[in-house]
Amino acid sequence: RYVLGSLETNGEYKPNFLDYQTYLSWQPTKRWQLDLIGNISENHYNFRPEDRNTNFGTMENVKNFQVYFDGQEKDLFRTFFGWLALTHKLKDNKTSVSLIGSIFTTKEQERYDIQGQYWLTQTETSENLGVGTYMQHSRDYLKATVGNVKLMTRRTTDHHHVEGALLWRMERVTENSAEYEYRDSAGYNVPHTGKDLYMIYSLRARNELRANRFEGYLQDNWNFRTGNDSVPTLYTLNYGVRFAHWNFNGETLISPRVSLNIVPGWNRNLAFRVATGLYYQAPFFKELRDTTTLNGVTYAKLNQKIRSQRSIHLVGAMDYSFRMLDRPFKFSAEIYYKMLSRLTPYVVDL
């Protein structure tokens, strides 16, 4: 409330926030373990603006912008998150199997009707440069639920740590949004055509996403050595592949990656690392919204032709550990190359 009260717009700010988190772990036997993570968050934002007074321009040309408001804004953001994992260690003590389930749900409401009458004046002469009114309206509702079920296994031996998993994700999102902004300047509607009445901004969106993702990965972390048995060169090779399929756009992705860490025997204070891989960033609801404008009204629809953003990484790095002034230091250097493609731009509301 104190931060909001320092803004240029004076008014009555009433934010309320609730956040509850919990983590529980139960191990009935040496081979079974149950873990639970929960989070509840709710944020109410109530705002009734009164006036705003802003000075801007140069020292020789100062202007004053003053607004008086009517109306209010009421927002609600509520989220629930739950995560449950059941892990079983096999008798060989090298293999474990986990069944993991999680669910995330959110409800968002942005509602406001605010009208403002404004005056723009020249500070030195009190000359009236402009007068007008505007009205902003919004009824935005969003509900989303994302559920996951994951089966994961791990196996550790003397030189290998193998991990693999299969995952199914359910996505359900419903959006119903209506926004507009009306401006009137000295008796003329803006924009003014002389014939039709248009809003300077109008948005309508009614969308529903019902999709499923299927994902999986398999990777191995291999430790080995070469050279002199007394002071060998140490290697850590990590390699794997990840796959994913999304039935919303029918896209199937395969993402291999590999990295190698080397600690040379001739100087254990040095460490080298090289890595490469093909990475994808799958879109979600925000990136799916595609807008088209017809007769002054912007409509938001979901783009089923969208594709995941893609990047090829090449990385080389070096670490050098040393002591100076009786203190430990580490010098690190890294060079990387990223080839980005299929980027998805979108607008962020500020």
Language model regions located:
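Face-selective signature of the C-terminal outer-membrane beta-barrel domain
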Residues: Q27-N43, G71-N249
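Surface-exposed extracellular loop regions of Gram-negative outer-membrane beta-barrel proteins
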Residues: E50-N55, W266-L314, I335-L350
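Alpha-helix termini
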Residues: F224-V231, P264-N267, F322-D326
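Short glycine/proline-enriched turns and hinge-like loops at secondary-structure junctions
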Residues: T233, G250-L253, R327-F329
